[in-house]
Amino acid sequence: MKEMSPGEFAARAAAGQPPMLLDIREEWELAIARIDDAVHIPMGDIPARLGELEPEQDIVVLCRSGGRSAQVARFLEQQGYQRVWNLAGGILAWSEQLDPSIPPY
């Protein structure tokens, strides 16, 4: 499983090649902290909603700290998605490295 740091994601976005940011956290977590433009599909809904994800698209999966998103990234790879990364450190790392306005929780 590949990982991408928040800084690498930001660099790709700045270069005009932003991957899809897939937020797999629960609704209550989004109420605390969210990243604009992220697509939200809760972890438990991923199998039923695979059709919403393009297999050819670059997808970066995020959760709070990187554990759940790593599981989803592995699952997507098993389903044939080859352009998938786990966001290293999750939204906590995003807050620390890119956007301190996002509260850690």
Task: Give the location of each predicted region.
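Short, surface-exposed ligand- or partner-binding patches at beta-edge/loop junctions that are enriched
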Residues: 62
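Rhodanese-like catalytic fold shared by cysteine-dependent sulfurtransferases
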Residues: 1-20, 27-58, 67-105
